Amino acid sequence: MKRLESSRLNVIFNENNGLSVITDNKTKTEWRQFYPIPPADATVWDCNLSDSTIWETDFSQSGDGLKGIFEEEPFKLNMKRNFPIPGISIFPGNYEVCIESEKPNSLSIAADVEYYTTILNRTGEFLLKTVPLNFKKTGFGYSARLYSDDMDDCTDAFILNMSFSANPKTEFSVKKVYLKHCTTECDPVSIKEVREENNSVLFTLTSGKTQSVQCRISVEDDTVIYELEADESEPFRERLTYPPMPHTGGELNWIVPKDSGLRLSACDIKHEANFKIPFGEFYVVPGLNMAFLGADAAEAGGCMMIVDTPLCARVGYTVANAGGTPSYLPHLQFFGDKGIWAQNRKVRFKFLENGNYVEMAKQYRKIAFEKGFLDTFLEKEKRDETFKKSVGTHRIDSGMDYRDMPKLCDALYKAGTKNVLLKFTASRNNGAYLNGTELFEDGILKEYSERYSDITLYEYENTRDLYLSAGEFALDKEYADFAKDYRVKSIKGKYLCGWVDIMGNAAYILCPHFAKKYLDFRLKRYPLKDYPYKARLFDILATTSLTEGECYDTAHECSRLETAEIRKEILDYARKNYRLDVHTEGTAEYLIPYCNTFEGSLSIMNYPGISHMQDRYEMDFNCRIPFWQLVYHDCASTYFHWEHGDLTHPTIPYDDALVMLYGERGMFLPFYSFDPLNTGLIDRMTDRIKTLNIVLERVKYDSMEEHSFLTPDGAVQRTRFSSGVTVTANLEKNKSYQIEGRLIEPWSVLVEQDGEIIFKTENESGGNIK
């Protein structure tokens, strides 16, 4: 054992396995590190048999199982119907798929398991392999083994595919389907050459079979520091699962910067959110938008993991053995850039007396300032007036008929709701998309410039996707010929594809080095004097993996680290060269100094149910926290992903309550097929904008100072902003609550400033406050 000490912390390092026990002398809490290996025989996933969306069958379903009588067709478990790819998180090891059945002799099972990585691999795929499963009869039903030898070290998740059949008229009953951990032979890393030097512990850390780096552990006051070093050009093609996140061994909540923020119970291993939320890389939609993770142990304090080098890192989230207790455990993994080490890594564990997420946000705000991410709206406006255009604006992504666009603008002017970013180019002509020149030639854009200049027009810009054939959109041959030589090549010389449109047409991925050429091409084709789109949303810029920038074409080679720099450069280039106000889809803190808004992260993206179209909420409200807003509300705004813009969906009051609670902006999608002008939808939209403005106009430059849950179930929440505005919202659809002598009915909002009520919900759909 090696020991390190500071004025606050005692660290005992185990030189046999690389794990530490850290005692916080201020809180008297003992924090232990664990590798993400589940306990033997622990259930790491329990299939919800009452979830009809993952079964292709008409049999009766309930929490007690599946029951019925076979006809001619088999019934199937199809997890892809309601699980985000890459599926259920898993750490490589040996597992067993178990099926409990009351009639084990009656079933025939054909099955396989698909293994996925959350990081686009070097050949351009997420699917690693498909392995057939051999089910055998047991005393409780059936089982099949999953072997670690079949899992690559970069396996992050799995999807099960199963087909059950039997003779016609055979009665059957499936009580339970679950995945159980068997054994994992060894730790994910090995330690050697341990030594002490200048109040530090140094050692050689080896991941997998060959990947070795030098590690130094030191301690300063309330922080334990890990530094990992190797030659930048050293080959590095495996995962390095180190250093582990500390855990108390008891109940705690993980504070996760996934979209707006999540608070997940570590020990609630059956909670749907725990096994359906993919963490993944930093600064990509399935991953995390801040280089941070938190552990809230309530009165026992808290711990923050701060990743100072996040660009070649991901976080997994699996069931682990936390001192004998099955617990979900986030685990940090470093990997190479184009197969080399590329940069040295640094991780800090900062221990807090108060583990509450609000306190963590205040601490992280200081860290963000140190890193240069805490760039407020006011500071950006002083630097560049183009930042002023979009502060406090809502987004309208219009899919209306283009002839109705002046009427839409008239409605916005009449209602006094001109604080919007409006997209013209999703407009339709009898249902078909228009191209940019049609709007110009018809004179709509000229009319707009003369009559509606207070409304800022914006346009999508997609520097990544290239279609070489017609599909959902007509082929742009001039652009295709211009861009095709900049397609990303994999290490095997294959051109990589990304997005697939609704017609099944796959787009090629373009190299990040093409970004400036793309924008120059677009602005030459659509000059601002004729096409007054003064704001640009860079589509998918911060939703996609930095790995998609790994290009092996010798004419324009690119790496992950270069891709991150190019993302910043293209936003800066658009603003400085063309005086454009720029925004992105997806959220990443390192882009804050370059833009004002990020689309989507008010949703919990890449989670089943991100919109009403999937007939469910995206996440339990008691799991959601406004961590992004607590850190960055006065720096960068977020809003719902575009699916939430549908003006007809039934959960609009919930969406608007959450927007007001978080002090954010609205997202609206008026669509031609609903005839929004003649059905009252536009009038309702402008009424909603006026209501949202009650908060937004008051807090758009504010920091968020506090957030709290006012009821045990988390339904009623309150936020407080630096101007003194407080917002209380009931996010529950069917239940009223008594709060401070007031009855707050479902989906209601109360806004106060300096103790005076300035708004309360009083409408049939949104409930009331009495």
Question: Language-model segments: what does each one mean?
Answer:
Residues L160-K169:
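Short beta-strand-plus-loop segments that form exposed binding edges in beta-rich domains
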